Amino acid sequence: MTSRMLAGQSVNPLGFGAMNIVHGYSSFPTPQVAGRLLNEVLDSGVDHIDTATLYGAGRSEELIGEYLKTRRDEYFLASKGGLSLVEGRGKIDGRPETIHAQIDASLQRLQTDRIDLYYLHRLDPEIPVEESVGALAQAVSAGKIGGIGLSEISAKTLNRAHAIHPIAAVQNEYSLATRNPEIALIDTCAQLGTAFVAFSPLYRGYLTGNLRDIAGLPKTDMRHFMPRFSSENYPGNLKLVDQLTTLATAWGTTAAALSLAWALAQGEHIHIIPGTKNSAHHQENMGAQTVSLDAAQLAKVGALINQNTILGDRYNSHQQKTVESEEF
């Protein structure tokens, strides 16, 4: 797959999100299994790994630092701060002193002296974005981070932040099921020369077509609290993804690979970071690199699952308060 630019470096646009190995969903692999998966990810040609202070209260960063420390020059490393796990809940804090402290802690956990891209994980409503970005700019000047990113923001906030310091990347949720960045953000990123990094490009497993029984997931799994996975909405959403699977099979691929290929085709500045704790699922995701879709196929896929056909909101009311992305 042709490389794309990210914070001044040329990387494979199909990266790897390292949340799933410690955070958010069901059971998690042992450290040894997670370490083998991380090395397999690099062996498969991925050279962009994304993590965060939040994930497992720093455990994701620790695993990357422990199991990839001898391969640090083989991959582009992105992490995030300004959102941490406190007593089991996410706490947003964009104060400059917090950002500086969390960058230093991330460097220690990751066993590195530089993080290629560091995001403000969530916008703090109590702190002007200019102050948070100013702190990140100081970290760039100090050589601790290579570029500044923002996550789950609007185009308006991106423009404000970019006036303080060039923003290398924006990371928002984006997939066939979640199209909010199409309102303004993807285009604004392109205009500013900012990469757009899509997290949850398989919409938390939904777009694989393999996630059938939500009720059977552990009670701590975050999908229990998301409206699209509710007992009222999910049966209808399964009908949509089953149609996607039929299309994928007819075109010689899988629903997962087709969904990822669709996302990558939405712009030359777009990167995706699907995550998994499963080796077979990772290999399936890598299949997106060989999926070639013409304009008619892209349109057909996009018309099948979108903001008008998917049932339910992306987040519940509490979760929605933590993001600033535009709404349809």
Model-derived regions, located:
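Active-site beta-loop-alpha junctions enriched in small/polar residues
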Residues: 19-21, 52-54, 80-84, 120-123, ...
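N-terminal small/glycine-rich loop or linker at the start of catalytic domains
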Residues: 7-25, 78-91, 114, 119
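Conserved, mostly hydrophobic/aromatic
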Residues: 16, 49, 64, 77, ...
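Short, well-ordered coil/turn segments that N-cap beta-strands
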Residues: 9-14, 45-48, 72-75, 112-116, ...
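Aromatic-lined glycan-binding groove of carbohydrate-active enzymes
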Residues: 181-218, 254
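N-terminal binding-site loop/beta-alpha segment at the start of enzyme catalytic domains
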Residues: 1-75, 328
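Terminal-tail/helix-coil boundary detector
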Residues: 191, 219-246, 250, 265, ...
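Glycine/proline-rich, positively charged
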Residues: 25-26, 86-180, 184, 194-195
